[in-house]
Amino acid sequence: MALTFLLRGGSRNAFDGDRNTGQFPANVGHLCEQLWDEARLGTRRTVTCSQNAVQHASRVAVSAVAEIPVAMVRRLLHMRLLDSGRLFDQWWMIAVDGTLQDRGHDTQDGEARHRYVLTASLVGPHGMTFPLMSEFMDMHDPVRDKEDCELNAFRRLATRLRADFPRRPICLLLDGLYPVKPVFDTCETYGWKFIATLREGRQPSAYDEAVQTMMLSPSLRFLGQRKGEDGPVEQTLRWTHDVPFGAHVFNVLFSGEISPTSATLWVWVTNLRLTHERVYAVANHGGRARNSIENLFNVEKNGGFGLEHTFCANTQASQNYHLIMQVAFILWQLLAKGVLHRLTQACRKLTDVKLVELLRTSLLSVPVTSDAPSFGQLRFCSSA
């Protein structure tokens, strides 16, 4: 299942098309450390079809598979490989957002059931994002049901996140759906920090209060610059303190940006302390880092992983397929930013798509031998 996503065929049929070609069956056996029983299975080596994988996935508890990405990220944390990704060298940033998993089959009453998933991803160094947890939700009307379903899923996800990482200092990166009392209460109860996009229509009174008090504090201003896709982006950061959000009081940060092609205003509400020394990091290393989870969804949707593709109709198997997709994404991050990055440093324009093509060709054509050297260490920077 993991190879289905690592090789980015986008569907089960694409994987089945090559599964018994060339050196692929023997290489998969070597990689999985599985000996081929010729007496029982014959001399021709094969890889099981995806339908058998679906049958197996439909029998395995989703909660058990969900522990795999958590265990992988926990291992990376214990190895201290991700320490440089913390905000202010303290807060582990976790981006939370929902997306369409796939459009399920029509129900008996003729309505389409949409499978949505809420994902929590750890923001790492060097632009990496590691999917950590997923909460699944079904809805018939994405426009009408999305808010209630996603906020309820957030409550369940927050409970799991707290149980698995009770002592980690966490800062949640949230979109404009989340600046509401239940989310504020959860962060206060668990001692979490948060940076959430603030939309004018979501909290109109708080937004107006923030604008008015910001205009009365001209000294709370910082001029900065960041690197943009089209050239340098000039930033004007302004902020205000103690803005009431119902029973809570938070800080609001405004970021006006002018790039060579556009002008944009970003607004965030946060319970982090804002000062002249800290606002640049809060805006650029915190608030804007939430885009990493949208980039993750974009790669999984359009980069061959198959997010939004219906891999199977069985709900349990479909959820397990999605979780293994997250496992494959973590593995790809480690490969692409680790050993493959060092091996291909001379090829600056080598894309992930080309790397996947080379990996697929190697598995089909080059035998994996048992005497291949093992990896000595894992690192993301050649100078480390």
Region roles according to the model:
Residues 6-14, 124-129, 330-342:
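Short helix-capping/linker segments at secondary-structure and domain boundaries
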Residues 45-46, 51-133:
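Active-site-proximal, Lys/Arg-enriched surface segment
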Residues 1, 15-16, 49-54, 90-101, ...:
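Short, conserved catalytic/metal-binding motifs centered on acidic residues
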Residues 144-205:
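Domain-level cores of phosphate- or acyl-group-handling catalytic modules
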Residues 1-47:
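Gly/serine-rich nucleotide phosphate-binding loop at the start of the catalytic core
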Residues 110-169:
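Electropositive, glycine- and tryptophan-enriched low-complexity nucleic-acid-binding patches
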Residues 20-22, 29-30, 34-35, 218-242, ...:
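A short, flexible helix-boundary coil/loop motif
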Residues 193-293:
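An anionic, glycine-rich sequence signature occurring as long contiguous blocks
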